[in-house]
Amino acid sequence: MLIGFSADIGRYLGDTKENCSTYTGPRWAATAVYVVGFLLLDCVIHTAQASVRAMMSDLSAANHGPSIGQAIFSVWMAIGSILGYAAVAYGTWHRWFPSLKTSACCDACADLKGAFLTAVVLIVISTVVTMLLADEQSLDNEGVGGAAFAQTCGGLNAFIDLFASLKNMSPAMFRVLALTAFTWLSWFPFLQYNTDWMGREIYHGNPNGVADMADDKYNAGVREGAIGLLLCSASLGATSFLIPKLCRKLTSKVIWSISLFSVFLIMAGMVAVGVVSTKGYSPSLSTSLTVAGPDNLNALALTMFALIGIPQAVLYSVPWAVAAEVVAGEGGGQGVTVGAITIVISLSQLLVGLTAGPIDGAFNKGNAPAFGI
C-alpha cells in the first residue's frame, strides 16, 4: 500500500502541487515513502521465502532429496511471477479503473497502484485460506524442548543462535555460502536493472521524462521488459521440472557451473546488444524513431530474457539444495542454513545496489558497465 500510494502520500507530505502530467522534477517525499515501502516488502519477502524454503527442505529430505523440494518451490515462484508480470506488462490499469489516477499519480503510477492493490487482495485471500485450512497444532516452549528451550527462546537469542551456528559451520558450508554470494553478485545487476536496460538502451527512452516522447518510449520499454520477464519466468518454470533429474545425472556442482557460464554468455550478449542499440543514436533523432523501437533488437532482447530464465531456475533451487544436502550430512538444521544463505544474498544485493549506479554513472554508458562486471 505504501508503494502504490507513495505519490499521493508524498503530495500530502510537501511535494509539489503541480499536476503530474506537466511536472518532471524530483518528488523527495514520495521517494522516501517508496523506499520505506520497498524496505518493508523486501523484509516480508525474505521472511516468507526463508521459512518456506526451510520447510520444503525438511519435507523432501527423507524420500525425495532437497533438490525436489527446491524445484517445486521454483515452479510456484515462476507461476506467480508469470501472473504478476502479465498483470503489469500492458499498462492498462488506469483505463480499467480511472479512479486510480490523481493529480499526483498519472498513468504509470496508476498502473502500479492497481497492481499493488490486486496483490493486497491476493495476500488477504491466501492468508485467510491458510489460517482456515492449515491443520497445525500449536506447541508451547515446554512442549518443544522443555525448560532449557523455554529459557533460551526469544528474538535476541535467535540472533545469538544464528551467529553461533555461523561460527561453527563446516568449511564445506562456508564454500557453499561464498559461491552463493558470488553467484548472486553476478545476477543482481540484471535483476535490478533489467527493465531499465530495456527502456533506456533498447528503446532509447529518458527515465527523467524531459520530453513526452522520450518518456513514452521509456515506459514502453519498461512494459516490454515486463513481457521479457514473463518469458523469463515461463522458461524458469519449465526448466525447474528438469533440475532434479539433471542434478542426479550430472551432479549439482556441474549444473551450478553450467548455469554460471550460461549467465556469463547471456550477460555479455546483453552488453553487446545495448552497445549496438545505442551506437550512433542521438536524442535529436527521437522524433523519427517509433515508440516500438528497432524490431530486430527487440526480438533479440526478449530472446535473451527468455534464455536467462534457464540458469535462473538453477539459481532459485540448486544453491539451496546443495546447502541442505551439506547440512543434512552434518546433522544440522535447515532453518539456520536458509537464514545464512538469505543473509549472504542480502549482503550481495546491498553491495550491488550501492555500487552499480555510481559505476554506471562514472562511465556514462547506461547499464552496460554493471552488466559487464
Regions found by a protein language model. Name each.
Residues R175-L179, T183-D212:
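Helix-loop boundary and gating motifs at the non-cytosolic
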Residues I45-A61, V314-E330:
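Intracellular juxtamembrane helix-capping segments at the cytosolic ends
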Residues T24-R27, T31-V36, T47-A48, V52-R53, ...:
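Intracellular loop-helix junctions on the cytosolic face of multi-pass helical membrane proteins
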Residues T92, A238-V254, D360:
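Helix-to-loop junctions at the C-terminal end of transmembrane segments
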Residues G331-G361:
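A late C-terminal transmembrane helix in Major Facilitator Superfamily
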Residues G225-R248, L265-M267:
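Transmembrane alpha-helices of Major Facilitator/SLC transporters
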